[in-house]
C-alpha cells in the first residue's frame, strides 16, 4: 500500500476528525487493463477533496466502486472505521454515498419532481406516493439552488443547464454524508456555479465529506481543501491544494510539463466553404449570418441561452430553420435532416456525447463506423475486416486508449468517448465539422492533445466551427470569433482583436 495515502491530510476545520470513508489498497482489474492499482484514499467530514487526473487515470472507476456499480478485485472500504461492502448502488446510498455525475442520468418523460425523488418518493399512510409533499420538497430543493424550475413539468422541456440543476437537487434530496460531484459545473453559467459552490460550502458546514472531480483548475482552487492526483490507475500525489502550484499538479497528472495547451498552427486561410445568411429558428435564434473559410477555426462564444448549440443543430439538420439561406462551396443547399448534412459533408460533434453522440452499449468499432457503412460494405453485406481497419485507423490517429475496439464504448472515460465521436465523423471525410464544447469534461493533458488535433485538421484544409464556453480555449484556438447573445449574432472578432474583456462585453451586452 502507498504509505502516503494511509493518513491523508485533514481539513483544519475538522482537526483530527476520523475519516467518514476510507478506501485501502483498492485494485480494479478488467480484461487486459488494471484500472486501479492499490489505491488508498480517505474522505474527512467538512472537507472538499479534489480528485484530479487525466481521462483514463481511474477517476470514473473509483466513482463506480464508491457508488456500488463495480466491486473491487482487491482492497477494502471502511465507513466510520467499519469494513463495508457496496454490493449494489442501493447499498452505497444506504451507507450515505450519493453522486452527481458528469452526464446527467435522468428521464425525459418523468416530471422534475419524479426525477428528483425517483426511488425514494415520500409516501402517504396508505403507502401511495405523496405527490403534494414530493412537489413541495422538490420546489424547496430547487429554490435552494436559486432556480425557479417548476417541479411539475417534464424533464424533456428543460435546457442542459437546468437538467444539471435537477441532477444536483436529486443528489441533495438523499440525506448523504459523502457527496461525489463528477464535473457538476460542466453546463452551468458562472452564476449557477457560484450558487453551487454556496451549496457545497453549506454541505461542508454540515460535516459532509465531498469528493469533487473537475478539470477546471480555477474551480478546484476556489472550492477544494485537499487533493489527490491519479495517473494510470495509481494515486501519485496528495496535499493541500491551495499550497500546491498548478504546474506541480499538472506534472503529477501527466508525468511531464504541458507547455502549450493551445498549439494553434498558423494556416493560410482559403476561400469561403460554408455561408449562412439570415438563418432563423422559431424560438432559439434569428438573423444569424456567418462565413466559414477553408482551413479556418471559427469560434462561437456566448453565455448559456445564447443559441449557439441550437444554431449548430440546425446546420446539422436536427432542427429545421424557419428561414435563411445556406451555401456550401458556392452551391445553395437545403439541410432538412442529419442525413442531408452528412451527405453534403457537414458533421456535428454534440455537447452531450453520451446522449446524442454515441450508442453506449455498442462496441467502439461499430460506433466509429456507423456513419460510414457504405465504405465498409459490399452489395449490402458488411465487411468486418474493413470495418475494423477503418475504426483502427482513426483510433490510432486520435490515440484512443482502450483494451480493444470490441469493448462497449460506454466503458471508456469521457475523453476517450469524445475521441470516438470525433473519429466516427472524420471517417466520413467531411468538409465542415462543428465541435460543440469539444473539451467539455476533458483533463488538461488530453485537452492539449485535442487542441493539437483540431489545429492539424484545419491545417489539412478542414473547415471547423468550434463552440466553447471557455474563454482561454476560444481565444487560443480561433482564427475569428462570432459572439451570440439571446439568439442574435452581436459581434465578429478577428484574431488580433480577441480578449476576454471584449468577448464578455459583447456576450453580456456591455460592449
UniProtKB/Swiss-Prot annotation:
Cellular compartments annotated: Cell inner membrane
SUPFAM superfamilies named among the record's database cross-references: P-loop containing nucleoside triphosphate hydrolases
Record-listed E.C. numbers: 7.5.2.7
GO cellular component term, pick one: plasma membrane
Top-level taxon of the source organism: Bacteria
InterPro entries: AAA+_ATPase, ABC_carbohydrate_import_ATPase, ABC_transporter-like_ATP-bd, ABC_transporter-like_CS, P-loop_NTPase
Binding, ATP: 53-60
Keywords: ATP-binding, Cell inner membrane, Cell membrane, Membrane, Nucleotide-binding, Plasmid, Repeat, Sugar transport, Translocase, Transport
Keyword Methyltransferase: no
Name of the protein this chain belongs to: Ribose import ATP-binding protein RbsA 3
Organism: Rhizobium etli (strain ATCC 51251 / DSM 11541 / JCM 21823 / NBRC 15573 / CFN 42)
